[in-house]
């Protein structure tokens, strides 16, 4: 049997108004409310009143009704709310079957905020006295009623029974034994105070007050057993002692800053002592010499030490690591600066890096002596620097072009032309012309680039020795670079190289003069051997043939496509809807379960499940 839901929303406004009057007590004439269904089974307020007995007698025996009342229990001024659900046996069967569920709906949403809930099925369940006792028990403690009730029985009980029982035997004993009464009183009086004291001890009135223990300041101590084994090794203690010891092999415990400061202090003290000893020796040796001039080396050394002392007073002392870092930084700045300013920058850095040279410039007498020494040191590194400029064309890295000699300024300017920031990604002229020549010599049969031979003949002869005078060891790795270059690009690059290399005949001038003679017949032999199958004899150039073989296979590959086996309707915007036997092309396997494809008929692109289709290729 289906339950019949209750309809309390149609007249919910009227029910709410009457309910607020009962709960809030704004209207003294309305202390209870009963809602009952009408002919359309819509619940609405049927009756209201102010008497609790009238409330209990107003329920209809043929309907399922619900009532709420505000009652003040006896002995209390606080009103309590009682909710009554009336379900008589004479009500319709379907309504009675759904009474439990509907009563919960009424109690939670329609008439909430009650103190007591009562379910009544006949008049015996609506007994006024029983309901009032339930309400009074729910109201809590009633102190006024308890005080009034306790005072009456205590007075009546103390006046009736105990007086008769106590006084009759005591009077008889005292009258019968008047002489012996003097002996027992002290005996009886002594135990009385003792018993009182015992009672007080039992009541714990003399116990000290309990204090709360703060476990943070006064924590509990571990209870150790009294048994202590003798002769047993405590492994934990031994391990803790071993781990607490520092390993002398470790140096991490030493503070590097403190160690460096200590070494600086010791070296400073040592230098000061040496200076003082030298000054004392000079003073003591001057009268013994008898006016002769002291050795020049000692004077220079003393003057240098004085300059060092002045420099240290004016500037804070720097560690060797700091001096090396400054020197390295300045060298990097020199390599990045212009070539014309490199020479003065190097001399300037040498003056700044030397601790003694900065202040020697201020002393007129020492200037001429140290300039001679500085000139010797400056002239010595010139040959290796000049050798580096000679080998510039053979080096790929642009960093080696940064330190030219003074004699080769125009040559270095021409070499560094293509290495401006805009041309960093381009190849060097000397390198690029070699690679196409060797490629054409080796790959004439495969590539068939006979059209590039005329520009090779037009290359000026003095430039050729420079190209082949470069080391031939790095040629095999270079063969792999120009393979993807097209013919048109090679011709344009060769023309640019001819223009750049024409005004630079000075580079091959340092190479041996007889080198061009054996190279000319080599070119003729290469031209003659071009039609001959010379490639198989050289096994060093295998990459080009596999590239040619792979190229025709790429256009033959077809994009994956599939045929739908079932109809599928998209569940989201990024999915694809298709019918059975539809063709899906351009499939991308983004996942094992979901693929990305394009519908051939409409061109719509989206995701679809892989188990709905069958791949065609």
Curated annotation (Swiss-Prot):
It is found in: Cytoplasm, Cytoskeleton. Residues 437-453, 483-502, 516-530 have a biased composition (Acidic residues). Gene3D superfamilies: Severin (3.40.20.10), SH3 Domains (2.30.30.40). Keywords: Actin-binding, Cytoplasm, Cytoskeleton, Repeat, SH3 domain. One of its GO terms (molecular function) is actin filament binding. Residues 400-411 have a biased composition (Polar residues). The keyword ATP-binding does not apply. GO terms for cellular component: actin filament; cortical actin cytoskeleton; site of polarized growth. Disulfide bonds: none annotated. Sequence repeats lie at residues 202-211, 444-453, 495-510, 523-538, 591-600. This is Actin-binding protein.
């Amino acid at each position: 049997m289906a339950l019949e839901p209750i309809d309390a929303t149609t007249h919910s406004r009227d029910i709410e108004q009457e309910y607020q009057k009962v709960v809030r007590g704004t209207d003294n004439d309305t202390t209870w409310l009963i809602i009952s269904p009408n002919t359309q089974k819509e619940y609405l307020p049927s009756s209201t009143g102010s008497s609790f007995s009238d409330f209990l007698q107003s329920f209809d025996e043929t309907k399922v009704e619900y009532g709420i009342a505000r009652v003040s229990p006896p002995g209390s001024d606080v009103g309590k709310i009682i909710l009554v659900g009336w379900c008589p046996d004479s009500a319709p069967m379907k309504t009675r079957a759904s009474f439990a569920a509907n009563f919960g709906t009424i109690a939670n949403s329609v008439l909430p905020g009650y103190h007591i809930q009562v379910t009544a099925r006949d008049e015996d369940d609506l007994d006024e006295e029983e309901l009032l006792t339930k309400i009074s028990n729910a109201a809590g403690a009633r102190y006024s009623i308890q005080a009034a009730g306790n005072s009456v029985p205590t007075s009546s009980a103390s006046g009736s029974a105990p007086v008769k029982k106590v006084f009759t035997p005591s009077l008889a004993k005292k009258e019968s034994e008047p002489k012996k009464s003097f002996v027992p009183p002290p005996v009886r009086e002594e135990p009385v105070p003792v018993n009182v004291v015992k009672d007080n001890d039992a009541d714990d009135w003399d116990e000290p007050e309990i204090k709360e223990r703060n476990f943070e300041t006064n924590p509990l101590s571990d209870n150790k057993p009294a048994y202590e084994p003798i002769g047993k090794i405590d492994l934990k203690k031994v391990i803790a002692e071993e781990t607490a010891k520092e390993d002398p092999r470790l140096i991490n415990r030493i503070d590097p800053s403190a160690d460096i400061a200590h070494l600086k202090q010791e070296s400073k003290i040592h230098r000061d002592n040496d200076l003082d000893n030298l000054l004392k020796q000079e003073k003591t040796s001057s009268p013994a010499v008898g006016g002769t001039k002291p050795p020049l080396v000692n004077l220079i050394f003393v003057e240098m030490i004085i300059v060092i002392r002045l420099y240290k007073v004016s500037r804070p002392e720097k560690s060797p690591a700091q001096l090396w870092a400054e020197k390295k930084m300045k060298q990097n700045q020199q390599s990045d600066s212009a070539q014309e300013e490199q020479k003065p920058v190097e001399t300037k850095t040498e003056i700044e890096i030397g601790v003694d040279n900065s202040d020697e410039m201020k002393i007129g007498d020492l200037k001429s002596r140290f300039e001679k020494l500085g000139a010797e040191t400056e002239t010595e590194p010139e040959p290796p620097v000049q050798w580096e400029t000679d080998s510039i064309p053979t080096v790929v890295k642009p960093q080696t072009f940064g330190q030219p000699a003074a004699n080769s300024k125009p040559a270095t300017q021409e070499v560094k032309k293509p290495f401006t920031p805009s041309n960093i990604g381009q190849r060097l002229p000397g390198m690029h012309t070699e690679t196409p020549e060797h490629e054409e010599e080796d790959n004439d049969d495969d590539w068939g680039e006979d059209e590039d031979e005329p520009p090779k003949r037009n290359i000026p002869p003095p430039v050729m020795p420079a190209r082949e005078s470069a080391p031939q060891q790095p040629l095999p790795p270079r063969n792999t670079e120009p393979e993807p270059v097209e013919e048109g690009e090679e011709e344009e690059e060769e023309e640019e190289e001819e223009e750049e290399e024409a005004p630079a005949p000075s580079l091959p001038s340092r190479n041996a003069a007889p080198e061009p003679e054996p190279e000319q017949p080599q070119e003729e032999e290469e031209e003659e051997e071009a039609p001959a199958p010379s490639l198989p004899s050289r096994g060093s150039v295998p990459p080009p043939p596999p590239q040619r073989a792979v190229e025709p296979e790429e256009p033959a590959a077809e994009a994956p496509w599939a045929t739908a086996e079932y109809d599928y309707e998209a569940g989201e915007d990024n999915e694809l809807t298709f019918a059975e036997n539809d063709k899906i092309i351009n499939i991308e396997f983004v996942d094992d379960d979901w693929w990305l494809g394009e519908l051939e008929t409409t061109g719509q692109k989206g995701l679809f499940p892989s188990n709905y289709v069958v791949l065609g290729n």
